[in-house]
Amino acid sequence: MHLNDCIEIDQKSLKGLWTKSQWVRELTDPKRICLGIIELETKKLLGICSAWLLIDELYITSIAVHPTHQRKGLGKFLLSDLIKRSSSLRTNQIHLEVKDTNEPAKAFYKSMGFKTIGNRSNFYKDGSNALLLAKETNNK
């Protein structure tokens, strides 16, 4: 388990979205899916993608790449892998939230086939709003 690496990526990429205990739960709960990319030489975790399986839907809780490795396609690789795995999980949709002002992330998710389906006011700690995004998988 790469707990400390997950916390480091979370702090550097997501401004400490989760606590250590939340990461422990995310990494150990069998109903949660955690994918990572590890650098072979150093065994260092470079990126993470985690999701919850909720009956026939996946809910992405986190996707982040260490700042020194961003813009190299690692986030796309992680999300593509999760989308592929959704087939064996027989999911119908994948859901996530994104800060409504995060233009690079919104463009990324749109390029991966996600569509805006709603919003949540005051969703984040700083009071900012979130957009709800979904991608149809129709894997049943």
Cite the ranges covered by each PLM segment.
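Positions that flank functional sites
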Residues: R25, T101, Y124
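Acetyl-CoA-dependent GNAT
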Residues: L3-T68, L79-D81, R85, L89, ...
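Accessory recognition modules or surfaces
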Residues: K76, S128-T137
